[in-house]
Amino acid sequence: MMRLNEVIQKGTGCIEIKSGYGLNLEDELKMLRVIQRMKETSKAKIVSTFLGAHAVARGMSQEEYVKLIIDEMIPEVGRQKLADFVDVFCDHGFFTPTETARILEAAATWGMR
């Protein structure tokens, strides 16, 4: 909250905060819940972004992880209304344009932009 208050004092009016380093449902939800609490208590406008597709979780294949994001993570984030937006790290060695489109389409069905 200290950094948040500091940027507010410097004139920032809107702040985007992303999840994305948990790489599993439990940790992604934990980060998004913290962001939700900040949204409820901050004077600034905060938008939350689900970035579960930041990297592939260790021990999973690319397709297994994409399936986890689409079938489990996005629906739970959507049910709890924890994210306004979704982001995908679409780049060589990470998520392909096809995987990115699948993830974005799934998130859109849950109201994430």
How does the language model describe each region?
Residues 1, 5-6, 13-113:
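Metal-coordinating catalytic core of metallo-dependent amide/deamination hydrolases
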